[in-house]
């Protein structure tokens, strides 16, 4: 039987480099601190959750994806190498110690998506670098998306009672949930997604972004409207999606940061921006790498 090779260890750093998207099963890497745990496969699939010493959990992220839209061509592609049926001009996943970076290129647009969990804090951090490798300018949108079960799992005949809203002056969207995971008794928590600049649009309602019959690989908001729809949520299933403007000259690169986490109080929610100041996400990533040397 012929042996098939899906990747190899990097020669210059402690990473395993996966060069084939379609591995026999999801190839996971794990990121964690004392209170927040996450994992991601070679195509971005995975979860993020906070738990306490008794194992009580809040499943904040039940899946994740990053999309790059071409507003002129009215098309979109993912930064995680999905869907499998579509060819990419370049794909690579680097599983490192405490982080994963997925690089994809298609239609002259290259993305580098890095995910990690900092040494402290109830959140995971995403850093996305986009490069225009075309000879012409590109008018793009960059959308970070996370499915969640912080408002309980979806059931076809179930009912969701939570709400989710936007705080655009703080560059974030948030919801609320009751959990005993942090305090030992039911406490109102504030799950959120934030970014390091002004959002162009957002979605918090799952049916507004994915659609009733859409999927992560084909969200109805992107297929029908080309981007997020500015939906807030009242007693429906929640999701988190933030869209950023990404206009690029030929050869230009831009970096965007996103954070998905849980704030225990509204005061903590108002302080999220401190960990998204220029250079801070990169500093947190270096700290993770240094701790694992």
Name each region found by the language model:
Residues 1-293:
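Anionic coordination/interaction segments
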């Amino acid at each position: 039987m012929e042996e098939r090779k899906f990747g190899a260890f990097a020669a210059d750093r402690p990473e395993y480099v996966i060069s084939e998207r379609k591995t026999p099963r999801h190839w996971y890497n794990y990121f964690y601190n004392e209170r927040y745990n996450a994992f991601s496969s070679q195509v971005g699939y995975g979860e993020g959750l906070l738990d306490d010493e008794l194992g009580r959990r809040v499943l904040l992220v039940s899946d994740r994806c990053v999309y790059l839209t071409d507003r002129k061509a009215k098309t979109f592609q993912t930064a995680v190498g999905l869907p499998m049926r579509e060819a990419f001009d370049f794909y690579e996943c680097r599983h490192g110690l405490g982080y994963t970076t997925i690089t994809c290129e298609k239609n002259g647009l290259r993305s580098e998506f890095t995910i990690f969990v900092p040494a402290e804090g109830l959140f995971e951090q995403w850093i996305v670098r986009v490069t225009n490798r075309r000879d012409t300018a590109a008018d793009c949108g960059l959308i970070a998306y996370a499915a969640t079960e912080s408002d309980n799992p979806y059931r076809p005949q179930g009912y969701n009672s939570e709400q989710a809203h936007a705080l655009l002056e703080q560059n974030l969207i948030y919801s609320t949930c009751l959990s005993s995971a942090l305090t030992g008794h039911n406490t109102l928590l504030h799950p959120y997604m934030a970014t390091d600049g002004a959002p162009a649009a957002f979605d918090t309602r799952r049916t507004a972004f994915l659609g009733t019959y859409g999927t992560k690989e084909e969200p109805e908001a992107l297929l029908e409207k080309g981007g997020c729809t500015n939906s807030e949520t009242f007693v429906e299933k929640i999701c988190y999606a933030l869209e950023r403007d990404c206009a690029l000259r030929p050869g230009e690169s831009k970096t965007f940061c996103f954070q998905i986490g849980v704030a225990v109080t509204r005061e903590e929610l108002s302080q999220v921006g401190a960990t998204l100041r220029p250079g801070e996400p990169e500093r947190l990533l270096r700290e993770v790498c240094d701790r694992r040397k």
